[in-house]
């Protein structure tokens, strides 16, 4: 028996995901009207689309400035896309704002991606973890595995793209960006950011 998909549900799905009406209706139909499964289906398809676009050049975009409540913390963010048309879209500006808020919310965030962490920092973190008392009597192989796991966890705390997205902890910042890529149809890249705290001098 064919599942009837009402327009209200399709519109709700479109509003939540940003996908087109026909795409939302198809997702609901394919999942027999199951709303949660339709969302997951669109999310996965969006990420697949985003992965295909990830190699495209991003020479446009904007410098976004965000001042946190109280005016004692500010973020300057450079975020790039492929065309000036997309750079002017509300969805792109919202993305820049939400990422800036993400950075402002967590002072541990220091870099955009894992590749931005220096080799010296990685060495220092590894030395610190190696020296912990609870590992000294462990067999070397087990110790190394534990250390690697702890190092990865420690480094990820510094990385913007690895964070749980503040507006939806079920996804990472990377996954959130991919969702926006699937909506706008262009590659998007967070290039760099600077955090300014009142009274702090580098």
UniProtKB/Swiss-Prot annotation:
A GO molecular function term, named singly, is:
translation elongation factor activity
The cross-references to Pfam families, in alphabetical order and at most eight, read: EF_TS
Localization terms from the record: Plastid, Chloroplast
Q: Main subcellular localization, coarse class? A: plastid
The record's section on SUPFAM superfamilies has:
Elongation factor Ts (EF-Ts), dimerisation domain, UBA-like
Q: Which GO terms describe its cellular component?
A: chloroplast; mitochondrion
This protein is called: Elongation factor Ts, chloroplastic
Organism the protein comes from:
Phaeodactylum tricornutum (strain CCAP 1055/1)
Name of the gene encoding the protein in the UniProt record? tsf
